């Protein structure tokens, strides 16, 4: 029992970690917009508040619906695109039956952020990110693919397991995400990373569970 409590506490701690640089960059971007486009600054403030509200909710819950996760991604992207207009494009391919699936918070947002931070170094155009979510037997298959510069071969086997220092960060986000996934679901759900000079794909499998099923079980047990 005590071991499980410690495990749950560690998972919630990992979920609660927010990149302070993102927060300060977002505030600086909004501050710069206040005088030249106050309406856009207002919209970005709403997105920023939504982003951090989701972070607080994620720290309390081990799972959220895929739909809420995609809203979190949208809030994050609106802030990044305000900093770097027209720098990248994101495409979604989401199976309809997956919308109500329960997943650990921030999975897709972290993978998208990782692509934006690391894949497109010094490249301002033709940057694409593809988010795919589909059913694979009893699992939810999640993948984020970019057409960036790829990961060096000497780092590929350790990313997600060991902190890798680079000019754009330490790579802790993938390490923490991998710990969360394996802590919740076991090694079957560990991150799978494939990379070449034409881009990188990070994927994982999560046991499928519907939010409708959970609500039904809760109502039955009352």
Map each language-model feature to its residues.
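Intrinsically disordered, low-complexity acidic/proline-/asparagine-rich linker or regulatory tail/stalk regions
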Residues: 215-222
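Short C-terminal beta-strand
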Residues: 200-208
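Two-component histidine phosphotransfer core
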Residues: 1-194, 200-201
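Short, charged/polar, Gly/Pro-enriched secondary-structure boundary elements
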Residues: 209-214
